[in-house]
């Protein structure tokens, strides 16, 4: 997917709106003055005058609309690494035990040599031991913002008749991590989120969040395999999640498994027998099916 970003004046903005009048879509982003989608390409015109085209046909649509692409456009493909980028990723959302760690990291081209020497890659391809070794080095060298939502707080916020669901809570965490990193004076040319939902759904949930920023976002599936900034965030987040899982286990006197398989059911049933439901409220995500499975194991 390509992302084209350019600055246009009021005259061209008016002309663009006229050309795309029959293709308009809604946008929950308060900084967007006009939004449209044509030929699979999302067009966002910001109040600042910045125009963003996202989609595989971005170049073709830009030419069709007679936009000054050659002079003012910045083009970013999946493999673009030669610009300063913020990348955001989360770990823990698929695990019954443990919280959710979300990290946004800022990687400048000058950091590439350091990162490659460390062997930074998709954290899902790295062993936990390797992650725990290199994460502290990344935290020291790379500007980043880490957030950890504990299981206890997660259970207060996520579930039926509660403020968030499993998707909207991640929108809130990613948005806050990026917002706080930008508040430190970071100036990225691109912000990439490892896509966990569609852009339209992300913006729908974003509407109820307090903090917003004008920078356009790029949503990329498996972004940690394409962007070093996202890979860095993935590694730091994984380490944060593992530390939290270990601490929760120490607090309860049990080794808590990662994931949501049968091992989690077994440990959860042991915790229920030893301490009752309060132990799962403290250490696990209650809305997962593992809770009912653990309760069923107690009756056998």
Swiss-Prot record:
InterPro entries noted in UniProt: RNase_HII/HIII (IPR001352), RNase_HII/HIII_dom (IPR024567), RNase_HIII (IPR004641), RNase_HIII_N (IPR024568), RNaseH-like_sf (IPR012337), RNaseH_sf (IPR036397), TBP_dom_sf (IPR012295)
The keyword Nuclease belongs to this UniProt entry's keyword annotation: yes
Predominant subcellular localization, coarse grouping: cytoplasm
EC number: 3.1.26.4
A GO MF term: magnesium ion binding
Domain RNase H type-2 positions: 83-300
Co-factor binding details: Manganese or magnesium. Binds 1 divalent metal ion per monomer in the absence of substrate. May bind a second metal ion after substrate binding.
Any GO BP: DNA replication, removal of RNA primer
The UniProt record lists the keyword Glycosyltransferase: no
Residues where a divalent metal cation binds: 89-90, 194
Keyword vocabulary terms for this entry: Cytoplasm, Endonuclease, Hydrolase, Magnesium, Metal-binding, Nuclease
Names of the cofactor(s): Mn(2+); Mg(2+)
Gene3D superfamilies per UniProt: Ribonuclease H-like superfamily/Ribonuclease H, TATA-Binding Protein
Catalyzed reactions per annotation: Endonucleolytic cleavage to 5'-phosphomonoester
A single Gene Ontology CC term: cytoplasm
Subcellular location: Cytoplasm
Protein family: Belongs to the RNase HII family. RnhC subfamily.
PANTHER family the record matches: RIBONUCLEASE, RIBONUCLEASE H2 SUBUNIT A
Known role: Endonuclease that specifically degrades the RNA of RNA-DNA hybrids.
HAMAP family: RNase_HIII
Protein name: Ribonuclease HIII
Organism: Streptococcus pyogenes serotype M49 (strain NZ131)
Underlying gene: rnhC
């Amino acid at each position: 997917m390509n992302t084209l970003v350019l600055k246009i004046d009021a005259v061209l903005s008016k002309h663009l709106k006229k050309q795309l009048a029959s293709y308009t879509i809604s946008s929950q982003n308060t900084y967007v003055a006009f939004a449209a989608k044509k030929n699979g390409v999302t067009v966002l015109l910001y109040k600042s005058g910045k125009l963003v085209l996202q989609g595989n046909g971005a170049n073709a649509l830009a030419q069709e609309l007679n936009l000054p692409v050659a002079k003012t456009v910045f083009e970013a493909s999946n493999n673009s690494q030669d610009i300063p980028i913020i990348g955001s990723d989360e770990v823990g959302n698929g695990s019954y035990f443990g919280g959710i760690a979300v990290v946004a990291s800022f990687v400048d081209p000058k950091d590439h040599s350091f990162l490659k020497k460390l062997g930074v890659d998709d954290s899902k391809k790295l062993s936990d031991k390797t992650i725990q070794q290199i994460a502290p080095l990344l935290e020291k060298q790379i500007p980043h913002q880490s957030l950890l939502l504990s299981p206890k707080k997660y259970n207060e916020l996520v579930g039926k008749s509660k403020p968030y669901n499993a998707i909207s809570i991640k929108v809130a965490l990613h948005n806050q991590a990026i917002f706080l990193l930008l508040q430190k004076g970071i100036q990225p040319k691109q912000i990439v989120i490892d896509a966990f939902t569609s852009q339209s759904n992300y913006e729908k949930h974003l509407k109820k969040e307090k903090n917003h920023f004008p920078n356009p976002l790029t949503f990329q599936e498996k972004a940690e395999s394409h962007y070093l900034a996202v890979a860095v965030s993935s590694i730091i987040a994984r380490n944060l999640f593992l530390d939290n899982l270990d601490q929760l286990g120490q607090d309860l006197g049990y080794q808590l498994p990662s994931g949501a398989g049968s091992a989690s059911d077994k440990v959860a049933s042991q915790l229920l027998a030893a301490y009752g439901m309060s132990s799962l409220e403290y250490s696990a995500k209650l809305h997962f099916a593992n809770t009912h499975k653990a309760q069923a194991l107690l009756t056998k």
